[in-house]
Swiss-Prot record:
Plays a continuous role in plant development probably in the structural organization of compartments. GO terms for cellular component: plasma membrane. CXXCXGXG motif repeats lie at residues 146-153, 162-169, 189-196, 205-212. The keyword Chaperone applies. The gene is DNAJ1. PANTHER family: DNAJ-LIKE-2, ISOFORM A-RELATED (PTHR43888). Keywords: Cell membrane, Chaperone, Lipoprotein, Membrane, Metal-binding, Methylation, Prenylation, Repeat, Stress response, Zinc, Zinc-finger. It comes from Cucumis sativus. It is a lipid-anchor. This is DnaJ protein homolog. Residues 411-413 form a propeptide. It is found in: Cell membrane. InterPro entries: DnaJ, DnaJ_C, DnaJ_domain, DnaJ_domain_CS, DNJA1/2-like, HSP40/DnaJ_pept-bd, HSP_DnaJ_Cys-rich_dom, HSP_DnaJ_Cys-rich_dom_sf.
Amino acid sequence: MFGRPKKSDNTKYYEILGVSKNASQDDLKKAYRKAAIKNHPDKGGDPEKFKELAQAYEVLSDPEKREIYDQYGEDALKEGMGGGGGHDPFDIFQSFFGGSPFGGGGSSRGRRQRRGEDVIHPLKVSLEDLYNGTSKKLSLSRNVICSKCKGKGSKSGASMKCPGCQGSGMKVSIRHLGPSMIQQMQHPCNECKGTGETINDKDRCSQCKGEKVVQEKKVLEVIVEKGMQNAQKITFPGEADEAPDTVTGDIVFVLQQKEHPKFKRKGDDLFVEHTLSLVESLCGFQFILTHLDGRQLLIKSLPGEVVKPDQFKAINDEGMPMYQRPFMKGKLYIHFSVEFPDSLNPEQCKALEGVLPPRTSVQLSDMELDECEETTLHDVNIEEEMRRKQAQEAYDEDEDMHGGAQRVQCAQQ
């Protein structure tokens, strides 16, 4: 009589996959798919971790092996009860994603799988979103391996070599460009869509119609952390379109910051413009600034302080939160401009001269004034003036070119 096997560790495989002991088969599949894609050696993952994931999934996805493992642990499987998890991890991965683990010349360890393309989505966010952090739920459609045929496209799992391309997936077309000149072009076979194989109409999978994949809607929650930057990427590994014999690519969201009407951001610092009246710049000011999180900041000058046009002032720790260091912030810079009155009457000028520093301009004698030519100042918009001059110069240059051509033509006649 055989004795009862000694009980050993029966939680390790669940921990490797990151699931609970009462996880369903669907939970196991999701956990294995996500972790296996992330740790696949073709994506720079850890080969040892990849092997452990395959071993854990192979045991827990088999009801008989899982029951033995739950009752007696890993040692019971190694001793032969129900068979151990000894298959090639690459075969398990390829079989899971719809490839044939035994076809095409042996173990998939010797064949590098093609990596699927990443799917890039722009994600518009406000400056408030980047300051406070937020989450956005987005519904996306993607291709997933057909669960009915396991990505084979047929009921029987069989396929035929495409007669159009002889299984290569590519066709060559020749184009005649002229005498003794031809152009040879290679393009995907239109009969098999570049797969190199075809499926008999009667044998096509009823669920995917022979396409090997079906469409699935999925909701992804994108977490925008405090302090993230414009153009920063948020990646969901292995969530792009699935395809047989292919390592699934990633879905990548690229943040696009919308322009803010008040604040400008430079790195971890914030900039805001504020206009003072002449009285405020000379005699002091105070105003309330509503920050990106709704707080009211009281901004005021020191007693007797004069703020000059184009001057900057800074407030420490009121800039943007630093990414992944949310309790540290940059600076808030305030750029001041001063609004001057259009004109002053004589009484106002006299009153100002009584309190402002004396004039620094040189007093000229009558004789010196007689020798000077008097000028008149007038207002001008310098940007418009420069644009007008450039347009006039371009017009004059065009006129010179056309006029010169006409003169040459006349001389030839």
